[in-house]
Amino acid sequence: MKSHTEYLVFQTRKRREMVHITDQVEEIVRRSGVKDGLCFVSPMHITAAVYVNDLESGLIEDIEKWLEELAPARPEYKHHRTGEDNGDAHLKSLLLHHETTLPVTGGKLDLGTWQRVFYAEFDGQRRKRVIVKVLGVE
């Protein structure tokens, strides 16, 4: 079994941002040399998420609205007693799911027609890393 690890680095311009990363993950899979296996993608931060969905601007807006309705930015989170102001970012990360595992077939991500990989940042404007680990056979 082969293992290959790389890191993606992001510094979003906004506090909350959805970044399409399918091409970057696909390139890491290609460089890995793995022909059949799994690709694990996970932010190394607890206020971000990686998810799979459609690359359609209306849907992305709907997801952002839904997350804000379920975990609105507000001052009364108990987490804020620590001096932080990002309680909503922690909850949004949980709602969207923290990481994803993707199938690799024939040396490529084996995604459905409309499936795309996204990095979701909820407490941005600083340097963040995402680990991409590819496991499988050559």
Segments predicted by a language model, with ranges:
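Active-site histidine-anchored catalytic micro-motif
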Residues: 1-138
